[in-house]
């Protein structure tokens, strides 16, 4: 038996087809008497807010997609290993402020986005007429990811007790360090909870299929 078309089913029931993970995050990470925020760092960053009486989840902006595209353009590498290139640069505050004006970031949730918006063409439009160093742009893109996540937290408007991070972005050491500095609550990879950060979404698909078959 093959179970598929999860995103289409979500849209048929009034959703946006993404993110699909919040219900699974609840199964994995909800803790008694604690509010837990789960950050998934794929190409796009999404957050799930878990408390005893609610589950909130939506996309908040780019995670790795812009950084991966930029390092491929300038260093012919598929990703910035450990965030080392970003760590060699400095945040360009005027550029960061400009990127944060993107209207999507200020829409209320639930919402979803993707590479159809956050891509190198979008970035190039913001860089037109500037002459910033490539490594400084990479560092600014990393900070932009963190600021998008912080803005998402602010929009939820609740105090969080624990931050759990999953997805490929957990391997970006500079990104994880910057995230940890951004929040007062402890911020850890899902690996600390016995969940491989690289396989959360793959396991999600198996979990949804099992739930579907069980009725």
Report the location of each language-model feature.
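Conserved ATP-utilizing enzyme core subdomain
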Residues: 56-146, 150, 212
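Phosphate-binding/catalytic loop of phosphoryl-transfer enzymes
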Residues: 6-78
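Glycine-rich phosphate-binding loops at beta-strand->alpha-helix junctions
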Residues: 160-180
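Generic structural signal for well-ordered alpha-helical scaffold segments
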Residues: 25-30, 143-154, 210
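Non-transmembrane, aqueous-exposed alpha-helical and coiled segments at domain scale
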Residues: 137, 152-156, 179, 189, ...
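Glycine-rich phosphate-binding/hydrolytic loop that grips phosphoryl groups
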Residues: 143, 188-215
